[in-house]
Amino acid sequence: MKRTDSTAKATAPNPPLAPLLVILGNTGSGKSALALKLAREIPAGIVNADSRQIYSQMDIATAKPTPAEMSEIPHYLYSFIQPDQPFSLAEYQSLAYQAINKLHTQNRLPILVGGSGQYLKAVLEGWSIPQIAPDETFRAAMFEKAEKEGGASIFAELVKQDPQAAAKIDPRNIRRVVRALEVINKTGAEFSKLQTKNPPPYRVLKIGIHLAREELYRTVDLRVGKMLEQGLEAEVRHLLEQGYAATLPSMSGIGYRQIAKYIGGEISLSEAIEQMQFETHRLIRQQNTYFRLADPDIHWITLEESMDSGIINLVRNFLADGGKE
């Protein structure tokens, strides 16, 4: 019997999903170096997933790729907004999808690189993010309350209004707590109820670089000294002289906040260094809540393995499996 058109359509194979490579891990683990290594071997482009590397004029403490590296390989979402420019997670997600899709049209493999768990999850899980404009008056009031009464005071308010959201937000992340309260205040709905997921049509390979915690601590401690040698103090002074306030969200990043305090005479240089190292260690522990060794979706490798040719073969096989490359 002749098959109908509808039957033929029903049995037609689905088109192959577009590939996406993700390189993740702790700060200082060598993600950018691995991305560059792969992009030199396989037609690719690099998409930033680090919430600190989006800002222009803030290069040293954020450990961005160098201008030479960015001119050699296509890079997206680096240094594209000013330090005082508001920028939301929803905006990042939209721009990341645009960059990924653009690379696909160029027959390049998109490599999403970063250690900002929220950025990565928003893209990979397809979060539906509330499109709520910032309420600067509300934010100022919340930040003032946190300053006077401690961050626990506003986190307690979030626990009261939306316990599900509070369970997923680090109470030390004041900006995220304030954002959740802001959305609740403007919509009258629980923040957690407004976040749904619709994963994008990508075939994903996640590669994580793992270093033992003590080894990673030593690496980032040495990197703090190197940042100062590279001119971090001058970079922060230049930002302050241009009128960028030390209280800006962009200036809350590790390195900028502490050096701004040193420049302002609040702490000594040695205290600034100690605080930078302490905060980086804390960031590493926080990142470990996003990037778990037990996660079966992540192909974990050591730093030594990231330098080996085997990692290139892994990516080539991933592309070949989907009929890409």
From Swiss-Prot:
Q: Which organism is it from?
A: Dehalococcoides mccartyi (strain ATCC BAA-2266 / KCTC 15142 / 195)
* NCBIfam families found in the cross-reference section: miaA
Q: Which PANTHER family match?
A: TRNA DIMETHYLALLYLTRANSFERASE
The entry's substrate-binding residues are 27-32
Please provide the Gene Ontology terms (biological process) for this protein. Answer: tRNA modification
An example of a GO molecular function for this protein is:
ATP binding
Q: How does it assemble?
A: Monomer.
Which EC number(s) does UniProt give? 2.5.1.75
According to its UniProt entry, the function of this protein is described as: Catalyzes the transfer of a dimethylallyl group onto the adenine at position 37 in tRNAs that read codons beginning with uridine, leading to the formation of N6-(dimethylallyl)adenosine (i(6)A).
Magnesium as a keyword of this entry, yes or no, is: yes
User: What is this protein called in UniProt?
Assistant: tRNA dimethylallyltransferase
Q: Which coenzyme or cofactor does it need?
A: Mg(2+)
Question: What is the gene called?
Answer: miaA
What catalytic reaction does the record list? adenosine(37) in tRNA + dimethylallyl diphosphate = N(6)-dimethylallyladenosine(37) in tRNA + diphosphate
Family, according to the entry, reads as follows:
Belongs to the IPP transferase family.
Q: Where is this site: Interaction with substrate tRNA?
A: 116, 139
- Region (Interaction with substrate tRNA), start-end ranges: 50-53
Q: Where does ATP bind?
A: 25-32
